Amino acid sequence: MKITWLGHSGFRIAIEQAVLLVDPWLTGNPLFPADRREEALAGATHILITHGHGDHTGDTVAIAKERGLPVVGIYDLVTWLQEKEGIDGIGFNKGGTVTLGGARVTMVQATHSSSMSGEAGPIYTGTESGYMIAGEGHVIYLSGDTDIMADMGWMGEYHRPDVGILSAGGHFTMDMKRAAFAARKYFDFRTVIPCHYRTFPLLEQSAEALKEGLPGVEVIEPQVLVPIDI
């Protein structure tokens, strides 16, 4: 299994026979090198989105049309994109599981907000979500944009994720200290990868507080387009 950061909250996850593009905001992303777009997209099988905000949906429609990839996510957002943009999609909801190229993807709770920009103001696009992604003997908890929440308790106990990809840049999500607290209290991760940080000055620029708060856990600060082997 390989997890490759695309900057901000974007990832490329190669697991089982699937290559998932998670929240692919590439165009205009200060951390993503535009001349390496093809490298990021090569072999992708699905686009997995956590919510409607532009720094997460980003290039979703463009990639879906260009590559003929299905967009996977919360029913409201996916069906709206299907009707508006004519793309393929797999819409489901909290507690539901879909199998993508052999990987089992279960939608779980997050606490944030979800909308897209419209001419008359924000357009509601369903609720925000996280995912448990199971395959190759591992379970990844992809938090999506969220703060700490009590639901993490049963989510950790039921799904038993060993890898956490946690939005932890603060301001819009939990910060590194809160993410460390959540990981200690609710999960038993072997590996934690922070995201939604370093993109803008108002977000945290380092994961040192996360590392300090998780002794004994491998905290990997991702580098853009450098694969992490799990």
Curated annotation (Swiss-Prot):
Q: Name one Pfam family in it.
A: Lactamase_B_2
Superkingdom of this protein's organism = Bacteria
**What keywords sit in the KW lines?**
Hydrolase
Q: Which SMART domains match?
A: Lactamase_B
User: Which InterPro entries does its entry note?
Assistant: Metallo-B-lactamas, RibonucZ/Hydroxyglut_hydro, UPF0173, UPF0173_UPF0282_UlaG_hydrolase
Question: Recorded GO terms, molecular function?
Answer: hydrolase activity
Member of which family? Belongs to the UPF0173 family.
Name of this chain's protein: UPF0173 metal-dependent hydrolase RHOS4_08540
**What organism does the record attribute this protein to?**
Cereibacter sphaeroides (strain ATCC 17023 / DSM 158 / JCM 6121 / CCUG 31486 / LMG 2827 / NBRC 12203 / NCIMB 8253 / ATH 2.4.1.)
Source organism lineage? Bacteria, Pseudomonadati, Pseudomonadota, Alphaproteobacteria, Rhodobacterales
